[in-house]
Regions:
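Extended, folded domain segments that form the structural surfaces/walls around functional sites
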Residues: 1-10, 39, 130
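ABC ATPase NBD Q-loop/coupling interface
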Residues: 4-20, 88
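ABC nucleotide-binding domain signature
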Residues: 21-30, 142-144
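Walker B catalytic motif
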Residues: 113-117, 124
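Conserved catalytic loops of ABC-family nucleotide-binding domains
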Residues: 108, 128-149
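ABC-family P-loop ATPase nucleotide-binding domains
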Residues: 33-111
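Catalytic "switch" loops of ABC-type ATPases
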Residues: 30-35, 148-149
Length: 149
């Protein structure tokens, strides 16, 4: 028998990383990579619209996307200057982690796998991450999932 990992009825081991993302899995890294020349705005718009396309939803217009981005940026208190720069380029460790939490907020995954989320964060960033991770999520059954201790 071949190994399998079932997530919402699908064997994750048979899916590409891209399809795992489409299924709602978010993976953060201990050391997020820099992507020179790719702005956060373009990166996130492509990611969000790919998720929407996979779900059979229309792409967000530029104004809809920018509104969503402003809302999520406010939740994680991401500086507008960071959102307009290349992905993680020249960011401090804490800025990279905050940026990952922003990406997670934008993509609204079903499952987030976080690697040393508190690594390199200052006290303000730790507070934001803690608040964000404690926000109730809604499960497919419609019940709030308050997470575990």
């Amino acid at each position: 028998m071949l190994p399998f990992v079932t997530f919402y009825g699908k064997n994750l081991l048979e899916l590409s990383p891209e399809d795992r993302s489409h299924e709602g899995i978010f993976l953060s890294f201990q050391y997020p990579v820099e992507i020179p020349g790719v702005s956060m705005v373009n990166f996130m718009r492509a990611a969000v619209n790919e998720q929407r396309k996979y779900k059979g939803l229309p792409a967000l217009t530029a104004s809809e996307f920018l509104k969503l981005m402003r809302e999520k940026r406010a939740v994680v208190e991401l500086d507008n200057k960071l959102a307009n720069r290349s992905v993680n380029e020249g960011f401090s460790g804490g800025e990279k982690k905050r940026n990952e939490i922003f990406q997670m907020a934008m993509l609204e995954p079903r499952l987030s796998i976080l690697d040393e989320t508190d690594s390199g964060l200052d006290i303000d960033a730790l507070r934001i991450v803690a608040i964000f991770l404690k926000l109730p999520k809604i499960t497919p059954s419609g019940n709030p999932d308050l997470g575990s201790a």
